[in-house]
Structures are given as C-alpha cells and as structure tokens.
Amino acid sequence: MQDPLIQFNRDPATAGISVAPDADGFYDMGDVYKAVPATDKIAFVIRHSKRQKNLGKESELTPIGVQMAQTLGSKLVSDESFYYASTDFVRTRETCNNIAIGRGETDAEVVTWDGINGGYFLTVPSDTLDALVSSKGGNQKYIAQYAYDEIVAAPSFKDQLVSYFQDFYPRGNQFVNEVILANMSSWKRVSILVSHDMLVEPLIVFVSNRTIDLKIYQADYRWANYLSGIAVISNDAGCVTVLPVRGDSVGWMINSQEVDESVQ
C-alpha cells in the first residue's frame, strides 16, 4: 500500500513478507525478522531501551531496560551477525550491546553514528526547541503535534514553532533514502540502529501515514515506547518496504504509568 506522500511500499504482502500487525498497527520485530526473505536487507531504527531518569548522555539502562533489550535479542536469534550503530549516548550503546547479548553475539561492535541523532526532523538544535516549549507542555507534546499536523497554539507562537521543524513527509522520505538506503550496502544484511524518541516518534507516524496513535497530547496520551521504531526492508527487485515495529509487547507507552525503578 503506497501513498502519494510516502515513496515506499507499506504493505508487506506486496514484498512477499507474510506478517501481520497488532491491533495498534505495529509489527513485532521478531516476526518481521523471521518473515523477511533471507535475500532481503533489513534496517531496524528503534528507540533505546528503558533508561534511568537522567536524560544526559551518561544515563544508563535500568535493570528492566537491560532485560527488555536482551529479550528482544532472543527473538532475533540466528547464525548471522548483525550490524549495530547507536548515537553517542550510553543508553543507546547499551541497548545495542544487550540486544546482541540476547542474540548470543559475544563480540558485537557498536558503531557510534551521528546520522541517527534525535534532531533529524528539526531545523534548530534540540535545546532551542526545549527552550521554546519547556513552559508550554514540553517537546514531546509539540513533536507529536508536528508529526500529526495538529499543532494548536497562538498564531505568533505557532509560526515560530513550525519554523523549528522540517517539512514532515519530505523529511521522512529523505531519512529513508539518504540515511538508510544510501548506507545499506556497507552494513550487514540486518542492522540495528538505536536512537531516541525525538527521531523515532516522527518516523513511526511517517511510515504508518499517521494511522498509529502516538498522540501524547490527547487521551490516551500515548508516546513511542522503548524499543519501538521502524523497519526498512529492501529486496533485490528494488522494492523498499517501511513498517512500524515494536521490540516490546506493545509499541506505545504512557509516561505517567512507567515503572519507577528508583523506589523499588
């Protein structure tokens, strides 16, 4: 299934991939990996696993986050080795390492890559966006409203806010073409690229053509879950398929319901 705004196939059956989404529209990463023909290349771009409350670069995975990543790895077990890349954050690198451990890879290398930094959909540094919206609901609210083209704000504030974001559909197509497909030939058949919610939230909305509910600004206040993201699948016939995927049991989370491991 294609849409004029999206340059890629969104129906796995068209590419000979027998896999079904869950009730929320997400495809399980393990199911996708098993269903994709062995001649196809796959790149998974996902959010890191559950991390400590600190948002700085040194924030580590929590015990639950370590287990989540290793459980995901156990669903991706095979004889082939994967390519792993992360941003320059401890939590993204640890996510790669623990997925590899779950797969049984003991010597996996994790490449640090700026190409998957969280600010891809922004025209300004993320700190600039934070400064503008910190007292008006925070960046998650406005990143989601941007992705769904539902920004609600006073005209002058809205004009400034809109200028901080790239054009949504062209930028999504550009990411798949220039960040993923342009580099696939130098990666292994399967790649795990671990980034942040600021990148993954818009990507999921993009590849689902705004059909998945991650509207944190309205009830049920859903946001991209840890280990959720997209799969980009390329076959020998030149068909490129993009799918929203999840590495955990559900693709979304509600921030207020997140388990606080610091009080356990």
What are these regions (language model features)?
Residues 3-121, 146, 154, 158-168, ...:
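Active-site-proximal alpha-helix that buttresses catalytic centers in soluble enzyme cores
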Residues 33, 72-76, 96-103, 129-136, ...:
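Hydrophobic, Leu/Ile/Phe/Ala-enriched alpha-helical segments that form helix-helix packing faces
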Residues 48, 87-89, 189-198, 245:
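Short, well-ordered beta-to-alpha junction loops that form the rim of enzyme active sites
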Residues 166-239:
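Active-site-adjacent alpha-helix immediately C-terminal to a catalytic or transition-state-stabilizing loop
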